């Protein structure tokens, strides 16, 4: 049995293409892997606080010196990190907002990129500690950005995943969604057609 962690980050509940892709992905994954355990964390329904002084203090101070607010922030970060550590497959559903990922997804990443837990510093540089895991990224984009200089989403997420040791990363892009009805339908259909290859 494998554990799949799905991170939803679209601000929209209705008419969200990234959520449509997630729904279809779950159906196909469950059909192919009925014994697997799937956990969904929705960052729109339960937002993760952005990085702040309390979390930094919780990370850096000895336990006896942490304030109540720092302990609370650390406990939240530990919960998110433990979910990631337990997962065999990470799925991030990410619409493109202003050429990159939603700030809610960035906040989640800030909580789980943890020195000594998901990566470590060595004499030769940082080393990812989550080797052996797989990541799948489902994106929804108003324009067509794949391979273009305007894409600050895929390169960033590939870099972050590699930093924590995840090198097996697949991207499925639904693009051109705001260009016209024809482009929208084509973009959604092409993305959905690729789901079977990763599920």
Curated annotation (Swiss-Prot):
Q: Which cofactor does it need?
A: FMN
- InterPro entries, alphabetically? Flavodoxin_fold (IPR003680), Flavoprotein-like_sf (IPR029039), FMN-dep_NADH:Q_OxRdtase_AzoR1 (IPR050104), NADH:quinone_OxRdtase_FMN_depd (IPR023048)
Q: Relay the cofactor remark from the entry.
A: Binds 1 FMN per subunit.
UniProt-annotated binding residues for FMN: 10, 16-18, 96-99
Keywords assigned: Flavoprotein, FMN, NAD, Oxidoreductase
Which HAMAP family would you find in this protein's record? Azoreductase_type1
Summary of subunit composition and partner proteins: Homodimer.
Q: Function, please?
A: Quinone reductase that provides resistance to thiol-specific stress caused by electrophilic quinones. Also exhibits azoreductase activity. Catalyzes the reductive cleavage of the azo bond in aromatic azo compounds to the corresponding amines.
Protein name according to UniProt: FMN-dependent NADH:quinone oxidoreductase 2
């Amino acid at each position: 049995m494998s554990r799949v962690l799905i991170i939803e980050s679209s601000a929209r509940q209705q008419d969200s293409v990234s959520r449509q892709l997630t729904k279809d992905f779950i159906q196909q994954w469950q059909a192919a892997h009925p014994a697997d355990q799937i956990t969904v964390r929705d960052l729109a329904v339960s937002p993760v606080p952005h990085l702040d002084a309390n979390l930094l203090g919780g990370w850096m101070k000895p336990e006896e010196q942490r304030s109540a607010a720092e302990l609370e922030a650390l406990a939240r970060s530990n919960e998110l990190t433990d979910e990631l550590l337990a997962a065999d497959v990470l799925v991030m559903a990410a619409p493109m907002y202003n050429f990159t990922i939603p700030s809610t997804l960035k906040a989640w990443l800030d909580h789980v990129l943890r020195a000594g837990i998901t990566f470590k510093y060595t004499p030769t540089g940082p080393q990812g500690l989550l080797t052996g895991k797989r990541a799948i990224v489902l994106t929804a984009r108003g324009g067509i950005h794949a391979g273009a200089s305007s894409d600050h989403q895929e390169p960033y997420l590939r870099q972050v995943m590699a930093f924590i040791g995840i090198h097996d990363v697949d991207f499925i892009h639904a693009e051109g969604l705001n260009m016209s009805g024809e482009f929208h339908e084509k973009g959604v259909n092409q993305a959905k057609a690729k789901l079977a290859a990763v599920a």
